[in-house]
Amino acid sequence: MKVQEIHKLLGNHSQGTYIDIGAFDGIKVNNTKYFEDIGWVGIAVEPHPTSFAKLESNRNCIKENIVIADHDGVSEFNWSDDAPMTSRVDMSGQKERIHDMKDVVKQQLPCMTLNSLCEKHNITQVDFLKIDTEGYDCHIINSIDFKKLHISFILFEMWEHHEELCYKLAIEKLINNSYLEVTKDYDIAFNDRFNRYFLKS
């Protein structure tokens, strides 16, 4: 789904708030730059140090060099300059993917939940949330307190072959919080390769 289609679903508003979790350099394979360019405000989160340095110079939004997790504190982050877009939080079920990376650095990074990030920046309404954390997306969704944070549109990657139960619970949680999965024709139950799109009804 093109970002312009998402914007249309959100009413083509000229003002809004986005959060980009796993922003990489803020340019490549990125769909929040569009919203920044039309005047929206937001936060871009990228734990990979080399990618974050590029993000700092590429974007004008708030930038956070942290891990978004299912808890506040510290998290082990595995990264490599050999594959910066596939670095990830260390967790069970992802070990084989970490081993595929060369020259892996294991680093302890500060982490917080999405709710804590939004509280830090006094955000209660998010119009567009993008999550791309190479297999950790479902954990982030399952940790969101939707009673405290209103999110209009959520885009995330689906790695169900690694975390089948986690993603099942995440989708159930979204449905139970009045989200509908969006298709190219704006119906439900469309899987765009790895990406899943949910709109608050």
Predicted regions and their residues:
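Phosphate/nucleotide-binding beta-alpha loop and adjacent structural elements of enzyme active sites
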Residues: 1-201
